[in-house]
């Protein structure tokens, strides 16, 4: 009987201790849930119609190869699909035809020749969008109302002045208080959207000179999308556990691998780096407030000098 009573006391103590333990743990979990900010759900947006790329702005040999000459415009999704299904091996690696016919930089070709196809650094289907985008080139001019307008990054003021002079856009004097405001017709917006792949930001067909200038600056800026990037310091590869290849004095890794490695070390709620990781890279990245991954990639890499091959 005494032994039974001792067991009851022991069980009673264990139950109280267990209850206290679980209560403390539950409180900690609740506190963590309360202090954390739940990621906001993105508002559902109506899917925008896909822009068609004018045939003359797509690499001519690609157009001929796939019989696209008579298309009124080529969807970028079609270009993506053709690239993925015709220039890659069954295991998703760029094949020899792709190396010859797609637009690759000289550095990219050298890297591909220096590494094995089984290497995670080898160009694969994750790079399809970059390769497909290179098959289209930016327009150097557009036509409207019988006039031809040339697009040059250092002559945008001249372009806007010419549009005004030709009355392709009209100054709206009533709205022009802090900045010159222009009326831009729907027909011109359609031409710009078709030819330059994006529309200017307008409200009720009105646009400020500043926004119009920024628009033409963006559309005339050269696309510098890279498959490989140069690391500023070999230690970065070690910190992020990145595969690399050395070309001369430079150490290269894949842009996508670097981006993914950085993203995986950012807390999804605070948008800050994990403290231990930030301590390792603080020499290269000076702040840890709401990390912009693309900006951090810039901090950790050296700008590439791009020389394209197979371009037309």
Swiss-Prot record:
Location of this chain's protein in the cell: Virion
Keywords, alphabetical: DNA-binding, Virion
Residues that span the membrane, as ranges: none
GO molecular function ontology, one term from the record: DNA binding
Upregulating conditions: Expressed in the late phase of the viral replicative cycle.
InterPro entries, sorted: Poxvirus_I1 (IPR004969)
Additional note from the record: Each virion contains approximately 670 molecules of OPG077.
Family affiliation: Belongs to the orthopoxvirus OPG077 family.
Protein name per its UniProtKB record: Telomere-binding protein OPG077
Species assigned in the record: Vaccinia virus (strain L-IVP)
Lineage, uppermost ranks: Viruses, Varidnaviria, Bamfordvirae, Nucleocytoviricota, Pokkesviricetes
Gene name per UniProt: OPG077
């Amino acid at each position: 009987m005494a032994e039974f009573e001792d067991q009851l006391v022991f069980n009673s103590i264990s139950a109280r201790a267990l209850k206290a333990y679980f209560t403390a743990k539950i409180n900690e979990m609740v506190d963590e849930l309360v202090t954390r900010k739940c990621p906001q759900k993105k508002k559902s947006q109506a899917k925008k119609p896909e822009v068609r790329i004018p045939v003359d702005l797509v690499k001519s040999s690609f157009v001929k190869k796939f019989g696209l000459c008579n298309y009124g415009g080529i969807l970028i999704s079609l270009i993506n699909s053709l690239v993925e299904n015709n220039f890659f091996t069954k295991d998703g690696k760029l094949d020899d035809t792709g190396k010859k016919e797609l637009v690759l930089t000289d550095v990219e070709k050298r890297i591909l020749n220096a590494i094995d196809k089984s290497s995670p650094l080898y160009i694969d289907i994750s790079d399809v969008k970059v390769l497909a985008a290179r098959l289209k080139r930016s327009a150097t001019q557009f036509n409207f109302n019988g006039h031809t307008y040339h697009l040059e990054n250092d002559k945008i003021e001249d372009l806007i002045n010419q549009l005004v002079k030709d009355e392709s856009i009209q100054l709206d004097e009533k709205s022009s208080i802090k900045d010159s405001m222009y009326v831009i017709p729907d027909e011109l917006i359609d031409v710009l959207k078709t030819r330059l792949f994006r529309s200017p930001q307008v409200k009720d067909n009105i646009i400020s000179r500043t926004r119009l200038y920024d628009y033409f600056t963006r559309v005339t800026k050269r696309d510098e999308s890279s498959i490989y990037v140069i690391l500023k310091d070999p230690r970065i590869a070690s910190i992020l556990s990145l595969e690399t290849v050395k070309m001369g004095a430079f150490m290269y890794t894949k842009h996508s691998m670097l981006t993914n490695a950085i993203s995986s070390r950012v807390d999804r709620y605070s948008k800050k780096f994990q403290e231990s990781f930030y301590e390792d890279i603080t020499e290269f990245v000076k702040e840890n407030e709401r990390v912009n991954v693309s900006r951090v990639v810039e901090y950790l890499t050296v700008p590439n000098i791009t020389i394209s091959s197979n371009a037309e």
